[in-house]
């Protein structure tokens, strides 16, 4: 099993490029199921989850290939007849596999999809997906770990539906389903993340009638059919945010290229609050970590609030602050599993339910640590960069689900980091 080995305490200087957003690429690729023909999705990161979705679509009868000259381009050929099944063997490691449910129901009128896997960071049920699809006219049964769904009459019907809680994949799944439904659909209390807007833009490019994607209310007028997709996904705001935090670590100076400043407002506000210098530059943001960070209080929230996917990374910065910070996690339970590993590096963190009190220490010291989920693994890499001595990050398969060869991106900045194949 691979591990990442870091010799920490070395200042980072230079520029780093942001890959395409995994959480935008996955729903856009799933949307290809809505239309027969040849599709092209650009700026796609080469990540485990993306490869898994490609295997899943291949199982369904689609042809999925990476561009020979441009590995960031994925081309898909979707046949008229698609096998509407997502077996457990292919989706057990990837929560986003549920995104095929809406397109399959909309185009084929039936689907059998295994309940999803992914990071073990608390209960992330798909009940909102199923309630909304039922409101669109689907009949759904949960049997033997699978969602068995069908559409009496063959075509979903438009509806008005309010999500009980904001859900990104739920909003995306229902948007895709409603794109081919008969009549008008109005979705309320929708997730407002940039990835939702990106999917809306992709659907519009396919000929869908969608308005309001990226706001809390989305209007969709169903059409009989859609044309093949051609779309470039947005940059990954969480990868960009991870590099921004790296730049804010004491003594560092990092420019993050391809970073969309509008997607980083909540994080930038906190970075400036801790004392980092953040400036807009051509094509991105520059961050300078000037001295020891100041403590701040952080509360995660759905977009446009502070992203839960950046909570662990920011905690690393606050572990070095001159004072005590408070982090409140409101989105997911069990999202402090990285804390025990940070403590191994010398951090002083106490957790009580959804609140973590972070008492800053002058320095961290390297040690072997074990990743528990995707964003925790990124936090441990950041901690290893800041720590003195050697840090080994184990279970980096979590890291590879969301970061495209992170060691190759950090090394040109001066980081002493390498992957050891296991």
Curated annotation (Swiss-Prot):
**A GO term for molecular function:** UDP-N-acetylglucosamine 1-carboxyvinyltransferase activity
Q: Which UniProt keywords apply?
A: Cell cycle, Cell division, Cell shape, Cell wall biogenesis/degradation, Cytoplasm, Peptidoglycan synthesis, Pyruvate, Transferase
**What does the record give as the reaction this protein catalyses?**
phosphoenolpyruvate + UDP-N-acetyl-alpha-D-glucosamine = UDP-N-acetyl-3-O-(1-carboxyvinyl)-alpha-D-glucosamine + phosphate
Residues involved in phosphoenolpyruvate binding: 22-23
InterPro entries given in the database record: Enolpyruvate_Tfrase_dom, Enolpyruvate_Tfrase_sf, MurA_subfamily, RNA3'P_cycl/enolpyr_Trfase_a/b, UDP_GlcNAc_COvinyl_MurA
**EC annotation from Swiss-Prot or TrEMBL:** 2.5.1.7
Broad EC category:
transferase
| Record's subcellular location | Cytoplasm
Please name the pathway: Cell wall biogenesis; peptidoglycan biosynthesis
List residues, modification 2-(S-cysteinyl)pyruvic acid O-phosphothioketal: 119
Provide the active-site residues from the annotation: 119 (proton donor)
Residues where UDP-N-acetyl-alpha-D-glucosamine binds: 95, 124-128, 309, 331
Query: A GO term (biological process) for this protein?
Result: UDP-N-acetylgalactosamine biosynthetic process
Gene Ontology, cellular component aspect: cytoplasm
Cross-referenced Gene3D superfamilies: Enolpyruvate transferase domain (3.65.10.10)
Indicate the family of this protein: Belongs to the EPSP synthase family. MurA subfamily.
Summary of the function given for this chain in its UniProt record = Cell wall formation. Adds enolpyruvyl to UDP-N-acetylglucosamine.
Query: Mind telling me what this protein is named?
Result: UDP-N-acetylglucosamine 1-carboxyvinyltransferase
- Source species taxonomy: Bacteria, Pseudomonadati, Myxococcota, Myxococcia, Myxococcales
């Amino acid at each position: 099993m691979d591990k990442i080995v870091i010799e920490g305490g070395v200042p980072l200087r230079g520029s780093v490029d942001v890959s395409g957003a995994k959480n935008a690429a996955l729903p856009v690729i799933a949307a290809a199921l809505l239309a027969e023909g040849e599709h092209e999705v650009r700026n796609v990161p080469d990540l485990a989850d993306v490869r898994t979705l490609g295997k899943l679509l291949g199982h369904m009868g689609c042809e999925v290939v990476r561009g020979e000259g441009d590995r960031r381009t994925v081309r898909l050929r979707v046949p008229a007849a698609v096998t509407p099944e997502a077996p457990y063997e292919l989706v057990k490691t990837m929560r986003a596999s549920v995104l095929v449910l809406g397109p399959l129901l909309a185009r084929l009128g039936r689907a059998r999809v295994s309940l999803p896997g992914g990071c073990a960071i608390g209960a992330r049920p798909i009940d909102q997906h199923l309630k909304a699809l039922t409101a669109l006219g689907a009949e759904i049964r949960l049997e033997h770990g699978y969602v068995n769904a069908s559409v009496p009459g063959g075509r979903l019907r438009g509806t008005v539906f309010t999500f009980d809680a904001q859900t990104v994949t739920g909003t995306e799944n229902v948007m895709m389903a409603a794109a081919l439904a008969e009549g008008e659909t109005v979705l309320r209390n929708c997730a407002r993340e940039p990835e939702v807007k990106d999917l809306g833009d992709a659907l519009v490019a396919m000929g869908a009638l969608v308005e309001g994607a990226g706001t809390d209310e989305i209007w969709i007028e169903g059409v009989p059919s859609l044309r093949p997709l051609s779309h470039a996904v947005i940059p990954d705001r969480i990868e960009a945010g991870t590099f921004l935090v790296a730049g804010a670590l004491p003594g560092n100076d990092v420019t993050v290229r391809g970073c969309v400043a509008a997607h980083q407002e909540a994080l930038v506000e906190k970075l400036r609050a801790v004392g980092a210098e953040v400036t807009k530059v051509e094509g991105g943001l520059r961050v300078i970590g000037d001295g020891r960070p100041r403590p701040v209080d952080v509360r995660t929230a759905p977009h446009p609030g502070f992203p839960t996917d950046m909570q662990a990374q920011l905690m690393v910065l606050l572990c070095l602050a001159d004072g005590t910070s408070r982090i409140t996690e409101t989105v997911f339970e069990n999202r402090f599993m990285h804390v025990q590993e940070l403590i191994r590096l010398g951090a002083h963190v106490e957790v009580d339910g959804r609140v973590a009190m972070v008492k800053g220490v002058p320095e961290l010291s390297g040690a072997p640590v074990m990743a528990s989920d995707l964003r925790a693994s990124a936090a441990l890499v950041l901690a290893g960069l800041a720590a003195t001595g050697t840090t080994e990050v184990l279970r980096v398969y979590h890291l590879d689900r969301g970061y495209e060869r992170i060691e190759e991106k950090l090394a040109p900045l001066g980081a002493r980091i390498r992957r050891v194949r296991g």
